[in-house]
A protein has these predicted regions:
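Compact, glycine-rich, soluble single-domain proteins
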Residues: 12-156
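C-terminal motif of bacterial Sec signal peptides marking the signal peptidase cleavage site
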Residues: 8-10
Length: 156
């Protein structure tokens, strides 16, 4: 099953270092946008080692398909967690996604089974990103913020 979009909202947590320079903001070319913001009211806390993120959980076909399409900014401490009813091969693409992301595939035990860097795509024929192992969850974070690796367990 292909998802029509990938999205992520970046989260800032007390354990994430703040950038010294606003030009380091992820997904932003404007100093007007904060790197770290309060999480949305419906955000769920998620930890990977010492890092904490606040993620928007999407668990319906419609919300998974929308993902982070057309969002032009994500705070560094936020992300999006795609939740599926079972563990299976999961394929994603970046159609109309404007922010570079890291896609993190998690198995049913919430262990990281794959991590791939994904670039924005504004054309019709976007590359497909397929996890190397079946996954029940796929986490999207701003590209480069994750300090975890394959084999780490995510807490949520």
């Amino acid at each position: 099953m292909l998802l029509a979009a990938f999205g992520l909202i970046a989260c800032s947590a007390p354990t994430v270092d703040l950038p010294e320079n606003r030009s380091q903001l992820i997904g932003s070319d404007s100093s007007e946008q904060p790197a770290y913001t309060q999480p949305p009211a419906n955000a769920q806390s998620l930890a990977i080692g010492e890092q904490q993120f606040f993620v928007e959980v999407v668990s319906t076909a419609a919300t998974r398909q929308q993902g982070l399409m057309n969002r032009d900014f994500m705070p560094a401490n936020q992300g999006m967690l795609f939740e599926f009813p079972n563990e299976a091969p999961r394929n994603f693409w970046m159609k109309n996604t404007l922010i570079p992301l890291d896609m993190i595939w998690l198995d049913a035990n919430k262990m990281i089974v794959d991590i791939q860097a994904a670039e924005p795509c504004k054309v019709e024929q976007c590359p497909i990103y397929s996890g190397k192992a079946p996954a029940q969850y796929v986490l999207e974070l701003n590209q480069g913020v994750l300090r975890g690796q394959v084999g780490d367990t995510v807490q949520f």
